[in-house]
């Protein structure tokens, strides 16, 4: 599967139910997808801490077999089991499928009161290298050497992914965010490759900004940004900053793309404190599912769902407790389906 170029029509997707509120929001989202006419088959697996307690593995073997076949994962929140020797499932999947692009859209909506009204930013964060490659050593007992790795291959693919997304989603501008004034070689290369690739996309405006300036601009004039493409560390920080602009992580979807694998999930965690109470908000996970639909070319279905959610949020009479209402997950889900 690729975001933009040759799109395979996938009608079977792998779904991980996860921990905490994961199973509840998964059930709701799959029912909404069906009601919207998404026309998908689901291979659903219980995954996470509970699965590990029961069977000694985070992901059942059948789950891996399913992903090898479908190349698409819709993943609800998962708790990493406590104890030594556990990488988070995301790190495991990122390494296994070389998920090089972390994509975080942040868009204001009427349900959450924030200081800004028309934020609509998508951050493309390189997911595999930079300082996060984890190459560190103690030179002596008082000195650590930490290495920043930037490669042409990884720069090219994240930058191309951002421009392809701009084309397929009718966006106008891509901004390269860097610190090339200080890291002239590493970030200089990232910026230079950005402008080289931008020439292949004459209809998309391309500019670059220094990361500290971007942090300031984002909290003053976030509406001036469209798509941001950046390295791993800057992307990690800026994507959470942008989340704060629109009221926090609770309503944010994300996707992780590899060359032939894509994973879609909500940014929020498994919220064990409200699990099983039937009041979880499925919106972020639903929007993650909309990103999945767009990825496989079902843009019309995604648009229909987004519109229905917007109408329910605007109406404001059927909202879950986290966004100021008293509705249950099921009531909220039914309101969305009624607006389809």
Regions flagged by a language model, labelled:
Residues 14-35, 140-212, 224:
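Glycine-rich phosphate/diphosphate-binding loop of Rossmann-like nucleotide-binding domains
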Residues 40-61, 218:
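N-terminal beta-loop-helix "entrance" segment that forms/cooperates
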Residues 1-8:
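Short, Lys/Arg-enriched N-terminal segments with co-localized hydrophobic residues
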Residues 49-51, 217-317:
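Glycine-rich phosphate/nucleotide-binding loop
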Residues 29, 33, 194, 285-293, ...:
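Buried hydrophobic packing segments
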Residues 19-22, 71, 124, 162, ...:
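Buried hydrophobic positions in well-ordered alpha/beta secondary-structure cores of metabolic enzymes
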Residues 41, 169-178, 201-209, 298-306, ...:
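Flexible, glycine/charged-enriched surface loops at secondary-structure junctions
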Residues 52-148, 233:
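N-terminal glycine-rich phosphate/adenylate-binding segment common to multiple enzyme folds
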């Amino acid at each position: 599967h690729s975001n933009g170029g040759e799109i395979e029509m996938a009608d079977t997707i792998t779904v991980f139910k996860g921990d905490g509120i994961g199973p509840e929001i998964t059930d709701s989202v799959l029912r909404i997808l069906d009601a919207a006419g998404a026309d998908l088959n689901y291979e659903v697996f219980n995954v996470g801490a509970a699965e590990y307690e029961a069977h000694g593995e985070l992901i059942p073997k059948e789950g891996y077999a399913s992903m090898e076949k479908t190349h698409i994962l819709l993943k609800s929140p998962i708790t990493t089991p406590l104890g030594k020797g556990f990488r988070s499932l995301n790190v495991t999947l990122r390494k296994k499928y070389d998920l090089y692009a972390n994509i975080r859209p942040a868009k204001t909506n009427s349900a959450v009161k924030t200081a800004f009204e028309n934020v609509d930013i998508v951050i493309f964060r390189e997911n595999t290298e930079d300082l996060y490659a984890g190459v560190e050593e103690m030179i002596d007992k008082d000195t650590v050497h930490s290495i920043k790795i930037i490669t042409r291959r990884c720069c090219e693919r994240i930058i191309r992914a951002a421009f392809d997304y701009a084309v397929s989603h009718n966006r106008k501008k891509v901004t390269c965010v860097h610190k090339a004034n200080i890291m002239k070689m590493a970030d200089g290369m990232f910026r230079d490759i950005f402008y080289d690739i931008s020439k292949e996309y004459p209809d998309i405006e391309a500019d670059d900004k220094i990361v500290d300036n971007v942090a300031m601009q984002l909290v003053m004039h976030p509406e001036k940004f469209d798509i941001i493409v950046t390295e791993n560390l800057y992307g990690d920080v800026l994507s959470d900053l942008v989340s704060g602009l629109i009221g926090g992580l609770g309503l944010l979807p994300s996707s992780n793309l590899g060359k032939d694998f894509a994973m879609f999930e909500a940014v929020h965690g498994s919220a064990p404190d409200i699990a099983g109470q039937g009041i979880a908000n499925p919106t972020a996970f639903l929007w993650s599912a909309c990103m999945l639909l767009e990825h496989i070319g079902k843009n019309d279905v995604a648009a229909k769902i987004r519109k229905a959610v917007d109408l329910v949020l605007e109406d404001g009479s059927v909202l879950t407790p986290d966004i100021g209402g008293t509705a249950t997950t099921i009531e909220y889900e039914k309101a969305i389906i009624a607006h389809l």
